[in-house]
């Protein structure tokens, strides 16, 4: 029987790197990719976001103005709550559709790559949860470099999420994705051997 494996971590811990490693053996249902589809130009969810936040929430081509929204919601808990209320159900529905589609292959497991796995309750449908970690200093540097953020802006984004220590405490498996990618690969391969036939 196919297992559902949750994959999460804090922002900039390198969860995407681990997801890519897992994708060599197992299908991935990526919540971020699904969100981009659900929140695409002209989609009902995008229209609801515009209705709530105003026209500045989209770019001229109809795509979400993600930098603007990101700055807004990472500095305003009520705005984040409103955005989540608009997007959660459409994304969850699309994810369930993707799980059903992936299960047609009858894999040993399906990876649910969900940044806010615990916050959105996905751990309840998972047989196991993998949490990707990195040190606070590494996370801060990665986020600043990746998103071109100041230290203060990067720290605000980190602080807006569930503390990584809480995610680690709830994990079945913890994968350290600090500075050494070879150790990360070894940990992922070791875990894969416990799941795949």
From Swiss-Prot:
Enzyme Commission designation: 2.7.1.24
GO cellular component, one term: cytoplasm
Binding site for ATP: 12-17
Signal peptide as annotated in the record: none
Molecular-function GO terms, alphabetical: ATP binding; dephospho-CoA kinase activity
DPCK domain span: 4-197
Pfam families: CoaE
Keywords from the named record: ATP-binding, Coenzyme A biosynthesis, Cytoplasm, Kinase, Nucleotide-binding, Transferase
GO biological process, alphabetically ordered: coenzyme A biosynthetic process
PROSITE patterns from the UniProt entry: DPCK
Catalysed transformations (reactions): 3'-dephospho-CoA + ATP = ADP + CoA + H(+)
Gene3D superfamilies: P-loop containing nucleotide triphosphate hydrolases
UniProt-listed InterPro entries: Depp_CoAkinase, P-loop_NTPase
Pathway assigned to this chain's UniProt record: Cofactor biosynthesis; coenzyme A biosynthesis; CoA from (R)-pantothenate: step 5/5
Location in the cell: Cytoplasm
Family named by the database record: Belongs to the CoaE family.
Function: Catalyzes the phosphorylation of the 3'-hydroxyl group of dephosphocoenzyme A to form coenzyme A.
PANTHER family the record matches: BIFUNCTIONAL COENZYME A SYNTHASE-RELATED (PTHR10695:SF46), DEPHOSPHO-COA KINASE-RELATED (PTHR10695)
Name used for this protein in its record: Dephospho-CoA kinase
Source species of the chain: Lactiplantibacillus plantarum (strain ATCC BAA-793 / NCIMB 8826 / WCFS1)
